Amino acid sequence: MAIFEVKHPLIQHKLGLMRKADQSTKQFRELASEVARLLTYEATKDLETESITITGWAGPVTVQQIKGKKITVVPILRAGLGMMNGVLDMIPSAKVSVVGLYRNEETLEPVAYYEKFASGMEERIALIIDPMLATGGSLLTTIEMLKKTGCRRIKGLFLVAVPEGLERIGRAHPDVEIYVASIDERLNEQGYILPGLGDAGDKIFGTK
């Protein structure tokens, strides 16, 4: 599995601001969107383009456009919604697919309660977005759901991740690419990433 830790200075600066314990909901939300925008730039560098001829101000001109069915953005509810606008700022024509998961309190594994995928998934590149990749359970379930639709090009965009989750995904789905702003140290006993961001969903939605 290809893992890209994007160490761009702007990303690292913005992520540092997000780690502040007293960061406001407004600022945290804006920063999540900004980092998502920068991660999208990195994750789409290999998109195929094709030449088309358009009418420019001085006559016909050949330009490049993205080839094929393009992209579907897949936020994992609810925290993934906090990154969606940042991705769509970069790819405004992208279709949005949605996955909703909850945790089974007995098995502690994610269970899908909602899914809505764009048409033609077998021809699309799926960008899964979620602020945190912790145990990898939610991502694993989402990847499996996407592959059942026929989607074969899948990438994940995360603000923070830990080695345990990355290793789990790598074993199960070595074909998936991961783009992450920071690979953090570890999970604590409660399953939170350290140093992490705290509960990113609560911070994005103001329910902390």
UniProtKB/Swiss-Prot annotation:
It catalyses: UMP + diphosphate = 5-phospho-alpha-D-ribose 1-diphosphate + uracil. GO terms for biological process: UMP salvage; uracil salvage. InterPro entries: PRibTrfase_dom, PRTase-like, Upp_B, UPRTase/APRTase, Ura_phspho_trans. 5-phospho-alpha-D-ribose 1-diphosphate binds at residues 78, 103, 130-138, 199. Pfam families: UPRTase. One of its GO terms (molecular function) is uracil phosphoribosyltransferase activity. The keyword Magnesium applies. Uracil binds at residues 193, 198-200. Binds 1 Mg(2+) ion per subunit. The magnesium is bound as Mg-PRPP. Its EC number is 2.4.2.9. Belongs to the UPRTase family. This is Uracil phosphoribosyltransferase. It comes from Pelobacter propionicus (strain DSM 2379 / NBRC 103807 / OttBd1). The lineage of its organism: Bacteria, Pseudomonadati, Thermodesulfobacteriota, Desulfuromonadia, Desulfuromonadales. The gene is upp.
